Amino acid sequence: MADEIEAWFDAAGPRGEELRRVDELVTAAAPRIDRQLVPMGSSAMLGYGLMPYRPRSAKETTMWPLISLAAQKRHLSLYVSAVVDGEYLAEQRAERLGNVSCGRSCIRFTSLDEVDAAELSALVRDAVAATAAGGNGYSAT
Protein backbone atom coordinates (compact mmCIF):
# COMPACT_ATOMS: atom_id res chain seq x y z
CA MET A 1 0.00 0.00 0.00
CA ALA A 2 2.87 2.40 0.75
CA ASP A 3 4.04 2.15 -2.88
CA GLU A 4 0.52 2.93 -4.13
CA ILE A 5 0.31 5.97 -1.86
CA GLU A 6 3.71 7.21 -3.06
CA ALA A 7 2.54 6.76 -6.66
CA TRP A 8 -0.60 8.80 -5.80
CA PHE A 9 1.57 11.65 -4.47
CA ASP A 10 3.80 11.47 -7.56
CA ALA A 11 0.80 11.47 -9.92
CA ALA A 12 -0.34 14.78 -8.40
CA GLY A 13 2.57 16.52 -10.11
CA PRO A 14 3.45 19.89 -8.57
CA ARG A 15 0.77 19.42 -5.90
CA GLY A 16 2.42 16.24 -4.66
CA GLU A 17 4.73 18.04 -2.24
CA GLU A 18 1.85 20.03 -0.75
CA LEU A 19 -0.18 16.83 -0.38
CA ARG A 20 2.80 15.23 1.40
CA ARG A 21 2.96 18.18 3.82
CA VAL A 22 -0.72 17.77 4.69
CA ASP A 23 -0.25 14.01 5.04
CA GLU A 24 2.63 14.63 7.47
CA LEU A 25 0.43 16.96 9.54
CA VAL A 26 -2.41 14.42 9.69
CA THR A 27 -0.16 11.50 10.59
CA ALA A 28 1.70 13.57 13.21
CA ALA A 29 -1.61 14.58 14.81
CA ALA A 30 -2.94 10.99 14.67
CA PRO A 31 0.14 8.73 14.60
CA ARG A 32 -1.77 5.43 14.82
CA ILE A 33 -4.28 6.23 12.08
CA ASP A 34 -4.22 3.92 9.06
CA ARG A 35 -3.94 5.26 5.51
CA GLN A 36 -5.40 3.87 2.30
CA LEU A 37 -6.38 5.08 -1.14
CA VAL A 38 -10.13 5.46 -1.57
CA PRO A 39 -11.59 5.35 -5.10
CA MET A 40 -13.51 8.48 -6.11
CA GLY A 41 -14.91 8.23 -9.61
CA SER A 42 -11.97 8.02 -12.01
CA SER A 43 -9.43 9.10 -9.40
CA ALA A 44 -8.65 8.43 -5.75
CA MET A 45 -8.17 10.30 -2.50
CA LEU A 46 -6.04 9.43 0.48
CA GLY A 47 -8.20 8.20 3.35
CA TYR A 48 -7.33 7.95 7.01
CA GLY A 49 -9.13 5.80 9.59
CA LEU A 50 -11.97 3.82 8.05
CA MET A 51 -15.22 3.88 10.00
CA PRO A 52 -18.71 2.47 9.43
CA TYR A 53 -20.92 4.82 7.40
CA ARG A 54 -24.33 4.49 5.86
CA PRO A 55 -25.66 7.27 3.65
CA ARG A 56 -29.37 7.99 4.07
CA SER A 57 -30.09 6.63 0.61
CA ALA A 58 -28.21 3.36 1.19
CA LYS A 59 -29.57 0.15 2.62
CA GLU A 60 -26.19 -1.16 3.73
CA THR A 61 -23.42 0.22 5.88
CA THR A 62 -20.06 0.66 4.18
CA MET A 63 -16.64 1.79 5.37
CA TRP A 64 -15.65 5.42 4.85
CA PRO A 65 -12.55 7.36 5.93
CA LEU A 66 -12.77 9.64 8.94
CA ILE A 67 -10.38 12.01 7.15
CA SER A 68 -9.69 12.24 3.41
CA LEU A 69 -7.21 14.26 1.37
CA ALA A 70 -7.75 15.14 -2.29
CA ALA A 71 -6.16 17.41 -4.88
CA GLN A 72 -8.70 19.46 -6.81
CA LYS A 73 -8.05 21.60 -9.88
CA ARG A 74 -7.36 24.81 -7.93
CA HIS A 75 -7.00 23.72 -4.32
CA LEU A 76 -6.54 20.88 -1.87
CA SER A 77 -9.47 19.45 0.05
CA LEU A 78 -9.27 17.86 3.47
CA TYR A 79 -12.53 16.17 4.43
CA VAL A 80 -13.15 15.58 8.13
CA SER A 81 -16.16 13.30 8.58
CA ALA A 82 -16.80 14.16 12.20
CA VAL A 83 -19.98 15.49 13.80
CA VAL A 84 -19.86 16.19 17.52
CA ASP A 85 -22.88 17.43 19.45
CA GLY A 86 -24.73 17.86 16.16
CA GLU A 87 -22.08 20.08 14.55
CA TYR A 88 -19.53 19.29 11.86
CA LEU A 89 -16.11 19.90 13.42
CA ALA A 90 -14.67 21.45 10.24
CA GLU A 91 -17.56 23.89 9.89
CA GLN A 92 -17.57 24.67 13.61
CA ARG A 93 -13.88 25.62 13.61
CA ALA A 94 -13.62 27.24 10.16
CA GLU A 95 -12.81 30.72 11.47
CA ARG A 96 -9.88 29.39 13.49
CA LEU A 97 -8.26 27.45 10.63
CA GLY A 98 -6.76 30.38 8.70
CA ASN A 99 -7.25 31.31 5.05
CA VAL A 100 -9.53 28.41 4.15
CA SER A 101 -12.96 27.84 2.69
CA CYS A 102 -15.11 25.37 4.58
CA GLY A 103 -18.20 23.38 3.83
CA ARG A 104 -19.77 21.06 6.34
CA SER A 105 -16.95 18.52 6.35
CA CYS A 106 -14.61 19.97 3.71
CA ILE A 107 -11.68 22.30 4.32
CA ARG A 108 -10.34 23.82 1.08
CA PHE A 109 -7.02 25.66 0.77
CA THR A 110 -4.31 26.25 -1.81
CA SER A 111 -1.31 25.80 0.49
CA LEU A 112 -0.74 24.52 4.00
CA ASP A 113 1.09 27.82 4.59
CA GLU A 114 -2.34 29.50 4.62
CA VAL A 115 -3.68 27.17 7.31
CA ASP A 116 -3.21 27.45 11.07
CA ALA A 117 -1.35 24.16 11.46
CA ALA A 118 -1.89 23.98 15.24
CA GLU A 119 -5.65 24.39 14.83
CA LEU A 120 -5.80 21.85 12.01
CA SER A 121 -3.79 19.37 14.07
CA ALA A 122 -6.15 19.87 17.00
CA LEU A 123 -9.14 19.32 14.71
CA VAL A 124 -7.66 16.03 13.46
CA ARG A 125 -6.89 14.87 17.02
CA ASP A 126 -10.39 15.79 18.20
CA ALA A 127 -12.05 14.00 15.27
CA VAL A 128 -10.03 10.84 15.98
CA ALA A 129 -10.75 11.04 19.73
CA ALA A 130 -14.49 11.60 19.23
CA THR A 131 -14.68 8.66 16.84
CA ALA A 132 -12.72 6.37 19.17
CA ALA A 133 -14.99 7.34 22.07
CA GLY A 134 -18.16 6.68 20.05
CA GLY A 135 -19.07 10.37 19.95
CA ASN A 136 -18.88 10.91 16.19
CA GLY A 137 -22.39 11.32 14.84
CA TYR A 138 -21.33 11.55 11.19
CA SER A 139 -23.05 8.35 10.10
CA ALA A 140 -26.28 9.65 11.62
CA THR A 141 -26.34 12.88 9.57
Annotate each predicted stretch with a short phrase.
Residues 1-141:
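Charge-dense, helix-prone N-terminal extensions
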